[in-house]
């Protein structure tokens, strides 16, 4: 996969826009999910994901072909998302949509293996509550929690994306989990 991406990047650097469209197709869902998990708003996540791809395209010449493209792209998206979070009004959370439920019905959440509807509702409510609590974490903790537990990235990848040492990543994950644990004690 990484070899194909590098091939496409070389084509993009030579002016082939279709090659970049292939790259977007590969990463669009992952980048959107990252933005959505950090912002909790569908429209803002779409805007930031689109902006991340635009920035990647415009700055593709600065990309070091010897590095991992996904890490570079995640860093762009993460930085843009953090910038958006910083610019938001403090009362944003009061008006935010419930994360993870855009366009989904309760019926679509029920698993076909015989899970009771009540259990599915409780699970969805818990998931939504956890997502809301994650959105209330400070930016530096929210970012690492989302990258580690939602996007399932390694500590090294998170460090590269955020341009911080792995030790700092571990500390932020620990402190983020502790902050999340304190928020969830009320349940």
From Swiss-Prot:
Residues covered by region (Sigma-70 factor domain-4): 125-187
One biological process term in Gene Ontology: regulation of DNA-templated transcription
Region (Sigma-70 factor domain-2) residue spans: 3-95
Keywords, ordered alphabetically: DNA-binding, Sigma factor, Stress response, Transcription, Transcription regulation
Disruption phenotype: Alteration (reduction or loss for the most part) of expression of about 60 genes that are high-pH-inducible, including sigW and its anti-sigma factor rsiW.
Gene Ontology MF terms in the entry: DNA binding; sigma factor activity
Start-end of DNA-binding region: 166-184
Domain of life: Bacteria
Motif placement: Polymerase core binding: 47-50
Transcription is among the record's keywords: yes
Functional summary from the UniProt entry: Sigma factors are initiation factors that promote the attachment of RNA polymerase (RNAP) to specific initiation sites and are then released. Sigma-W controls genes involved in response to cell envelope stress such as antimicrobial peptides, alkaline pH, transport processes and detoxification.
Quaternary state and interactors: Interacts transiently with the RNA polymerase catalytic core formed by RpoA, RpoB, RpoC and RpoZ (2 alpha, 1 beta, 1 beta' and 1 omega subunit) to form the RNA polymerase holoenzyme that can initiate transcription. Forms a heterodimer with cognate anti-sigma factor RsiW, which prevents it from binding to the -10 and -35 promoter elements.
Domain notes: The sigma-70 factor domain-2 mediates sequence-specific interaction with the -10 element in promoter DNA, and plays an important role in melting the double-stranded DNA and the formation of the transcription bubble. Also mediates interaction with the RNA polymerase subunits RpoB and RpoC.
Protein name, as recorded: ECF RNA polymerase sigma factor SigW
Gene: sigW
């Amino acid at each position: 996969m990484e070899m194909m991406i590098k091939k496409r990047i070389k084509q993009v650097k030579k002016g082939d826009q279709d090659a970049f469209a292939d790259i977007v197709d590969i990463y669009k869902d992952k980048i959107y999910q990252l933005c959505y998990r950090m912002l909790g708003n569908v429209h803002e996540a779409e805007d930031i994901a689109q902006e991340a791809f635009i920035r990647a395209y415009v700055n593709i010449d600065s990309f070091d072909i010897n590095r991992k493209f996904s890490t570079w792209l995640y860093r762009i998206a993460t930085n843009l998302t953090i910038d958006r979070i910083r610019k938001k009004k403090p009362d944003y959370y009061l008006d935010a949509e419930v994360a993870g439920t855009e366009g989904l019905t309760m019926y679509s959440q029920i698993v076909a293996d015989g899970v009771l509807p009540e259990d599915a509702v409780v699970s969805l409510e818990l998931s939504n509550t956890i997502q809301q609590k994650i959105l209330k974490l400070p930016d530096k903790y929210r970012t690492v929690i989302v990258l580690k537990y939602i996007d399932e990235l390694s500590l090294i990848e998170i460090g590269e994306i955020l341009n911080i040492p792995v030790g700092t990543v571990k500390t932020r994950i620990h402190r983020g989990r502790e902050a999340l644990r304190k928020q969830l004690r009320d349940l």
